[in-house]
Amino acid sequence: MELNKLTAQEVAEMIQDGDDIGLSGFTPAGVPKMVPHAISEKALREHEAGRPFKINVYTGASTGQSCDGDLTNAQAIHFRAPYTTNKDFRRHVNADELEYQDMNLSNMATQLRQGNLGNVDWAIIEVSDIDIIGDKAQLYLTAAVGISPTVCRMAKKGIFLEYNLHHAGKMRGIHDVYEVEYHPYRTPINMTGPMDRIGKPYIEIPVDKIRGVVECNIADEARSFTAPSDTTDQIGQNVANFLLDNLRNGLIPKTFLNIQSGVGSTANAVLGAMGNCEEIPNFGIYTEVLQNSAVELLLSGRVTGASACSLTITDAELQKIYANIEFFKKHLILRPSEISNNPEVIARIGVCAMNTAIEADIYGHVNSTKICGTKMMNGIGGSADFTNNAYLSIFSCGSTTKEGKISSIVPFCSHIDHTSHFVDAVITEYGVADLRGIGDME
């Protein structure tokens, strides 16, 4: 069956004011790029003509400049959920120019299924391959999964595919697509380890839901992170030493724990320090986002296997995966965010959660979303999904920010995302505050 080929501009003309749009991807990885940009251009034309045009945007997590950035600058977004890292979007949110709901990433697909965010009119999905078998289409995703299975199934008006030749023929066998059931009919998720497969390597949909295919050849808009510093390197070393001390004292199993690591230069430094510590056994990763350091640890064998939702890596690192794809099919799995961040699975398999704080207070509370308690930074992301259900929950940050002018350790947080009930340790470049088994005054 021949699928309808469209330009991004033709797709944009089919999107109407007030439509609810579900996108593939998780971080800039796997996000459609041509169509969102074309929608932003349409919005500018409509506004210049004096006509209203705004859409509601639902994603797995953050996106790239061609999506969050361009749509925001074109004033094309009315409502957005659940997470973003784009500086242009942040500026408009903090100026109260659009509506934004920050939520736990594990819950996004469920919120859509329950109808709490309205309906999904269109799904726009980046794919690496499309197989047509009878009246069904099998969609092979690219460098992330996010909420793609859910928005594909829910899309009332149809699905547009961005067939990205940059990934064509290279991602088959990496994904494990599984969607949980509706309440109250959910069954247990049949996973006891990070490398268990429970679904299919593709999304299967009725072929008649596909309204058109846009071809492109574009690399992911990989985020740039702050270069490692003496501070981040020391934090990484302190985390590795803390885990090693726990291992020696029998507080974590001899086989070690599965690691969840957040996003950014500190997270890369932590994984690097763990990989360099010979006394730490080889370990698995169960996380939402894989960064460059994890790819190297997989290739070296220090990481035995990694489960994630997204490959938030440079294109050079992605090409390493493609060059060694048969190896990575055995050692890497990409899942929907409601599985990669699922509290049930995290609690079962034994995870050490390591995330970054904006500020932490002397009671053990953590702020990870709002600067000075009022200005949104990015969002809670998956930090609560992992922190609240982990075997061991760690937050790290530099002791100061803004060139040493503002302390990150405060008497009481200006905003609290994670209460002391779920925070086991806070680590800076100066050391570790182990909060387990002590009272507030201690």
Regions found by a protein language model. Give the residues of each.
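Conserved alpha/beta enzyme-core scaffold
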Residues: M1-E442
